A protein has these predicted regions:
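Helix-start/capping segments and mature chain N-termini
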Residues: 6, 13-222
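Extended, Lys/Arg-enriched charged tracts that mediate electrostatic binding to polyanionic substrates
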Residues: 1-8
Length: 222
């Protein structure tokens, strides 16, 4: 069940300003898995031309307007065979930000690295869930900028153990390849015992009530 809160201005005006009245809705819809990957990781295109969000904008908020700039590049990437776009920063087009509707994580050595919340990245609920669980499991976490060059270097050196995305619709999904500047970066193959799979199992068990929720994340609806 996918649950999406929605708030929109409902004032009867065409004036270019904030509305004085709003309507709040909650949309619930049964959905299938976001990626029909059949156990395989997804294929991302690191976008170095188009930008999802820039400093000083609304990239850190879940606003409908943020999707406008992504529609054409997402359509183009899907036509080219990619599952999603890996968005880079809007200034240098070097630093990883997020992957489509997901926050992104890299398991490098004994550390989990994820882009920090700098105002252009959504503070995803699943991101927070993943970080909380990883800290409870004893993993070292770094929330910081990470450049594609660092990812490539870590992969070549054998230090990149896996990469995965996390979001409300996708839950947790492994990343198999990243296309960057005309080249494919093949990431380490992950299996049933990967960290990504462990996180997926833990989160879905919490969602379905199989595992006890000690965080107050689940709410019983009568």
């Amino acid at each position: 069940l996918y649950i999406r809160p929605l708030l929109f201005g409902s004032e009867g005006t065409l004036a270019v300003r904030a509305a004085s009245t709003y309507r709040f809705l909650i949309i619930t819809a049964p959905v299938q898995e976001y990626f029909d990957r059949q156990g395989q990781g997804i294929y991302l295109k690191a976008e170095h031309r188009f930008t999802r969000a820039s400093p000083g904008g609304t990239g850190g908020a879940k606003t409908a307007g943020n999707y406008a700039a992504t529609l054409q590049p997402m359509s183009d990437s899907a036509s080219a065979g990619f599952d999603q776009i890996l968005w880079l920063d809007g200034v240098e087009h070097r630093y990883v930000e997020e992957a489509g509707q997901m926050n992104i994580f890299f398991h490098i050595g004994d550390t989990i690295v994820t882009p920090d919340l700098s105002g252009t990245i959504l503070p995803g609920i699943t991101r927070d869930t993943v970080l909380t669980i990883l800290r409870e499991w004893g993993y070292k976490i770094e929330e910081r900028r990470i450049a594609m060059d660092e990812v490539i270097t870590a992969n070549k050196a054998g230090n990149l153990r896996e990469a995965f995305g996390a979001g409300t619709a996708a839950v947790v999904v492994p990343i198999d390849r990243i296309h960057y500047l005309g080249q494919d970066l093949q990431l380490p193959q992950t299996g049933n015992h990967s960290l990504c799979q462990q996180l997926y199992q833990m989160i879905t068990e919490l969602q379905f009530g199989v595992t006890q929720d000690n965080h107050g994340w689940s709410v019983l609806v009568d």
